Structures are given as structure tokens and as C-alpha cells.
Amino acid sequence: MKRDKKEQVVQEVAEKIGRSQGIYLTEYQGLNVAKMAELRNEFRKAGIEYKVVKNTLVKQALLQLAQADKLADGLKSTTAVAFGYDDPIAPAKIIRKFSKTNEALKFKMAAIDGIVYGDDKLVMLSEMLSKTENIGRTAGLINNVVSSVPMVVNAVMRNLVSVLDQVAKQKQ
């Protein structure tokens, strides 16, 4: 690859890293072309970009963004990078699911919001709720609270009426 092409790739990778909410490094050695295409399709369906890039070029892109020290340990052997633009957790779910049936795919590490997660954290990351799921749960909790307030007020009023009715009966 010529120098100007390498510089272009470094710029593209740096731009993708800058836009990403989550960056995942995987080792794909041993995956055949069909399995790699299947994995890319899974990522594509979720709006995730998955690229095979030379380790040195990824490292140069990380240096431009002052993040090389965080992910440099994962840049060994064959590396492919998953860029999670909208949901930083979605790549972890796909990697975990795919690696259950394809042992050749290995999770190396991830960086989400500046925090680096090692290869032992894939299960934890994949079990986390996505941003959309968290918003949905929060909205559901708020809705439950709002809908239960009138019921509580009605119960208090019903109890008060019952007490007043019993007091009135005792006075008769």
C-alpha cells in the first residue's frame, strides 16, 4: 500500500473512531470468507461498521486522537474493528452471539466513552441494556408512578369515607 493510501486510511479510521460511541477490537483469524460475510451482515443490520485494518494504521489513527495508550494492547495479530455509532453496546451483543457458534472470532477489547474493557468483559458488556432500552425502562417507571398516584389518592379518599361512615353509624 502506498503512503498516500495509508494516510487516507488513517484519516478514515480516525474519523470513524471520532464518530463512534463504542469501538470493539476483534481477532478474526480462522474465519472463512462466508463466515466473515455473515458477521459483516449482522453488524450492518445493526448499523455497525466492521473493518479489517492494519494494526499500525489503527494505532496511527488512535495517536491522532490521543487514545493510542488505551487500545494499543489489543492491536496484535489479525484485527478487525467494529464501530458502534448509535449504540455502543450492540457490537458486544453481536460479537458474543456470533462467537458462540464461531470460535475463530475472538473479542480483544472495547472502548466506550473513554473507558477500556478487556477481553474478560464481553459477557458484561453484552448483557448491558442499550440506551434505547434504558430510556424505555425509565419511561415505563415514570408512567407507572404517574398512573399509580390517582389510585393512591382514591384509596385514601375511600378509606376516609369508610371511616366517616363508621363514625356516623356509631353515633346513631
Curated annotation (Swiss-Prot):
Cellular-component GO terms for this entry: large ribosomal subunit
One annotated GO molecular function: structural constituent of ribosome
Database matches in InterPro entries: Ribosomal_uL10, Ribosomal_uL10-like_sf, Ribosomal_uL10_bac, Ribosomal_uL10_bac_type, Ribosomal_uL10_CS_bac
Keyword list, A-Z: Ribonucleoprotein, Ribosomal protein, RNA-binding, rRNA-binding
The keyword DNA damage appears for this protein: no
GO BP annotations, alphabetical order: translation
Protein family per UniProt: Belongs to the universal ribosomal protein uL10 family.
PANTHER family, alphabetized: 39S RIBOSOMAL PROTEIN L10, MITOCHONDRIAL (PTHR11560)
Function (record text): Forms part of the ribosomal stalk, playing a central role in the interaction of the ribosome with GTP-bound translation factors.
Subunit structure: Part of the ribosomal stalk of the 50S ribosomal subunit. The N-terminus interacts with L11 and the large rRNA to form the base of the stalk. The C-terminus forms an elongated spine to which L12 dimers bind in a sequential fashion forming a multimeric L10(L12)X complex.
The name this protein goes by in its record: Large ribosomal subunit protein uL10
Organism: Chlorobium limicola (strain DSM 245 / NBRC 103803 / 6330)
